[in-house]
A protein has these predicted regions:
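A structural feature recognizing the 12-helix transmembrane core of secondary solute carriers
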Residues: 2, 38-40, 63, 85-86
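Vicinal oxygen chelate
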Residues: 82-126
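N-terminal beta-strand motif that seeds the catalytic metal site of vicinal oxygen chelate
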Residues: 1-18, 67-70, 121-126
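Core segments of cupin and vicinal oxygen chelate
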Residues: 8-47, 51-53
Length: 126
């Protein structure tokens, strides 16, 4: 079976979005152009930022239709990341809370893509 290893978000400005994600992820993109930016994350996972104005074929929707999910090492890291991102001015959709699967919160990036940070409860980890 194939394994998903690449997510592309359609953004208004790849250069601005790349600066935003570089700040959040603590790493620089490996590729940038006026229409595209690429980050290579842990274990080879890739995050692409493609201009919604030049994506081919053209996309009808952008932002808010899914979530980019980032796992952290423990519940305290969920709260610390929330405090950090709040201090950076990110819009928050959900304050840190405990749900069935773990501790989590949801923020928005500049293009209204949902960013979920979570730490799974032990029973949810399998």
């Amino acid at each position: 079976m194939t394994t998903p290893n690449f997510v592309i978000l359609y953004v208004d400005s790849p250069e601005k979005s790349a600066a935003f994600y570089a700040s959040l992820l603590g790493r620089q993109p490996v590729e940038t152009s006026p229409t595209f930016a690429l980050f290579v994350l842990d274990k080879g996972f890739k995050l692409g930022l493609w201009s919604r104005h030049t994506v081919e074929p053209a996309a009808a929707a952008s932002g808010g239709g899914g979530e980019l999910v980032l796992a952290v090492e423990d519940a305290a890291a969920v709260d610390a990341t929330h405090a950090d991102w709040t201090g950076r001015g990110l819009a928050m959709l959900q304050a840190p809370t405990d749900l069935d699967f773990g501790r989590t919160f949801v923020a928005l990036d500049p293009d209204n893509h949902r960013l979920r940070v979570y730490w799974p409860f032990e029973e949810a980890q399998g």
